[in-house]
Amino acid sequence: VHGELRQTWAQTYARCRRLASSLQRAGIAKNDTVAVMLPNTPPMVEAHFGVPMAGAVLNALNTRLDPETIAFMLDHGEAKAVIVDPEFATVIAKALTLRQSKAPLLLIDVEDEVYGAAELRVGQQTYEEFLAAGDPQFAWELPGDEWDAIALNYTSGTTGNPKGVVYHHRGATINAISNVLEWDM
């Protein structure tokens, strides 16, 4: 549920598979970092599943950070792609000018009807255009090793630049099982 959008879990799964497929078609490979600067919207949920389905590592950027810190994280995490909501396009646009790396980035704009029309676009294409090229039946594979990275998060950087913290599939699985047990699901 997001604004007027109603989507089943089957539809969400197909969209996650499309995202994974599209990322791989765009050259995103195992252990590549895909950064996202999104609020709690369907594309954020899809990224949490679709990015690992592509074998890539999700870097969910803190939406309250300044462009300088975002630029550092994009460089340090060696992001290969960035998916951005229009709400944060100005911050991302500025961060892109501050990057030290000259490596090209795949930039994808989410069109968020709840937020409104984008005043600024930073991407080469929209998220829906990107997904449309993907395969809803994409045959994704489980990680080959439970210690493979699933996410890259950053500390607050109170003693300098933020520090990258890598999460692995094993930790994500154990955390999910712990939640089921703790919440008596």
Which functions belong to the PLM regions below?
Residues 1-41, 45-49, 66-71, 128-129:
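Conserved AMP-binding/adenylate-forming core of the ANL superfamily
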